[in-house]
């Protein structure tokens, strides 16, 4: 298979006209040549933090605080999940997965509520889809054993030492929320030696020093943080210290659109477009241990083809900036997963 157009090549997303040569799902070559194609070829997205279980309750809880919305065990999300039957939860998640696939997401890192059964429900929701998520079980060691790792709610919610050690012994991924409500749980989260931290809205200089010294990646979800009224993470400062990826967080409060997350982060921070696009692709893949997120030889051919001649993208003078700040679902020509 060949994919032609203006290709955003490598980790710097250098625009080159040509074709991506794909064999058996792997990028074999990138050939520079005139193609006459108006397509823009970018890596498919990696959504580095999601909770798609609450797809059953989109826009529920308007005006509620963070704790009232999502804090375990009795936040609105958890009450709704307990009161909803399995079939409905699977069907709602399946529609979210379909939406992510259609909008160019190759993988998502899911903090999966519900223990072992929660992991099983997500796998049922993935039937006939090409999206390949990284599933982090929650609540129990058994859920971790049945998934790709463990996603902890936050150090203030319990003692995660035993689960952290079990996850390490299993050679799996351990992520934890930190600094979402305030700074109090950031040091305890770092003490667990996590593979990555999520949110870090209230990160302070001493935390940044520890994060940099220990090379702990960060996942930020700025749209979600605004909805829950906790502030916004210092994305620019984090990006100067560590690997930063973007996530869309709860479907209850935000659509799982990486286009929207990129645009918001770009306009919030005014970071270079290439930096933001890395946060939506390569950096999430790096955190999750995936072989995608960048167009180069030997990578998995997870590609998103945009129409560079759409009403929205035509006449763009900076292709990467246009992709980050204005591209959307309507501009997609094809998704190759």
Language-model regions: role of each:
Residues 191-192, 234-310:
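His/Asp/Glu-enriched, well-ordered alpha-helical/loop segment
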Residues 43-55, 172-181:
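Histidine-centered catalytic micro-motifs
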Residues 181-183, 195-256, 263:
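Active-site neighborhoods of metal-dependent hydrolases
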Residues 1-34:
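N-terminal metal-binding scaffold of metallo-dependent hydrolase/deaminase domains
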Residues 111-195:
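Metal-coordinating catalytic core of metallo-dependent amide/deamination hydrolases
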Residues 300-337:
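C-terminal cap of metal-dependent C-N hydrolases
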């Amino acid at each position: 298979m060949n994919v032609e157009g203006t290709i955003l090549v490598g980790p710097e997303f250098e625009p080159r006209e040509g074709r991506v040569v794909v064999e058996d799902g792997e990028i074999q070559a990138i050939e520079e040549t005139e193609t006459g194609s108006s397509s823009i070829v970018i890596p498919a997205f990696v959504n580095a933090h999601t909770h798609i279980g609450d797809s059953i309750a989109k826009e529920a809880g308007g005006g509620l605080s963070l704790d009232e919305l999502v804090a375990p065990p009795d936040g609105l999300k958890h009450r709704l999940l307990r009161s909803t039957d399995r079939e409905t939860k699977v069907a709602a998640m399946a529609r979210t997965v379909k939406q992510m696939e259609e909008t160019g997401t190759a993988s998502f890192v899911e903090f999966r509520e519900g223990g072992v059964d929660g992991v099983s429900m997500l796998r049922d929701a993935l039937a006939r889809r090409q999206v390949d998520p990284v599933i982090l079980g929650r609540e129990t060691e058994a859920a971790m054993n049945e998934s790709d790792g463990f996603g902890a709610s936050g150090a203030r919610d319990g003692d995660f030492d035993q689960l952290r050690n079990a996850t390490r012994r299993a050679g799996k991924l351990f992520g934890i929320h930190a600094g979402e409500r305030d700074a109090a749980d950031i040091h305890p989260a770092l003490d667990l030696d996590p593979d990555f931290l999520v949110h870090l809205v209230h990160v302070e200089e001493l935390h940044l020093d520890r994060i940099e010294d220990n090379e702990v990646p960060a996942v930020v979800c700025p749209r979600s943080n605004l909805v829950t009224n906790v502030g916004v993470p210092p994305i620019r400062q984090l990006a100067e210290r560590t690997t930063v990826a973007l996530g869309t967080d709860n479907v209850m409060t935000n659509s799982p659109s990486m286009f929207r997350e990129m645009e918001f982060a770009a306009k919030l921070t005014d970071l270079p477009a290439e930096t933001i696009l890395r946060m939506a692709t390569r950096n999430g893949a790096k955190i999750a241990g995936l072989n995608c997120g960048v167009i180069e030889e030997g990578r998995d051919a997870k590609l998103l083809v945009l129409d560079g001649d759409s009403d929205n993208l035509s006449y763009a003078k900076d292709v990467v900036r246009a992709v980050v700040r204005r591209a959307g679902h309507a501009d997609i020509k094809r998704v190759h997963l």
